[in-house]
């Protein structure tokens, strides 16, 4: 239940046809940020921008749209990106240089160059951070750095820990609750870790998905911005934290 809380959407480009997993997503989960993949249809027909966030009709909103490391793009998608940037979106990725699709032509390539010069600038540099309209075009920075500059903290931080590990997590939100699902994907137990969540002002509860028991988490720290909870996990163990 609830709406997924996701900070980053990654545009698949032509990668969906080639079954490519892009390098941008490889560290996002470990850094504490969730991401989605989107295709051209979602960009063209569902995305809008409100208060600097990229929004979908189902209530999901993103801080960033990340473009693939590809030289080609459809003119329709590029025109929509231009519209979203002027409306306030932050777009992360390299400058496209040519067209793809049924209408690939020299004239379309000229249109693409005109739009990319407007958005990315006329100089092709390894680091780009340009304000265009109400939005930004960024390239050459790590995604977590860009989010940090936007004052977007990781949704989940693993602070004190007894070993080097990572957790899979899903965060959903409804009108009353923030719901985190946490899973240890290792065959070793996690004896101790302090997890820091991007929520505050609520009492956390732990729900065991195996037996359905719910207990109030009495030991936690709410610093006014984040909630810090000591946790442990059985091998392949999981549970929900609801606040």
Which residue ranges define each predicted feature?
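Carbohydrate-binding surfaces of carbohydrate-active enzymes
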Residues: 1-243
